[in-house]
Amino acid sequence: MELQREQQGDKTVLTLPDDVTIYTVAELKEALSPLLHQGQVLELNLANVTEIDSAGLQLLLAAKKTALANGYPLHLVWHSYAVLELLELCQLSGFFGDPTLLPHAEHP
């Protein structure tokens, strides 16, 4: 799976697709894994995510834990409504430690 990747100084920004579910997480993990070991800050842009399930959430949790274990920060940015809703439902907003601001145009 080809993901939009942008280098911004000392960090890499990876934009996730609209579907982060059991049907796509294996491919997403394969694309994300090398970036977790590159030794620099990684941001996951979640603005495009319209569908996320427990498998997608597990991917985000595993990515965060791997980044922390490797000593490099991983930040979730531009949370979509679908992502915010799942994080709140599972009471995991605090785990990631990133501000969770909803873009103005995305309220239900």
Go through the PLM ranges and name each one.
Residues 1-52, 62-108:
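STAS-like cytosolic regulatory interaction modules
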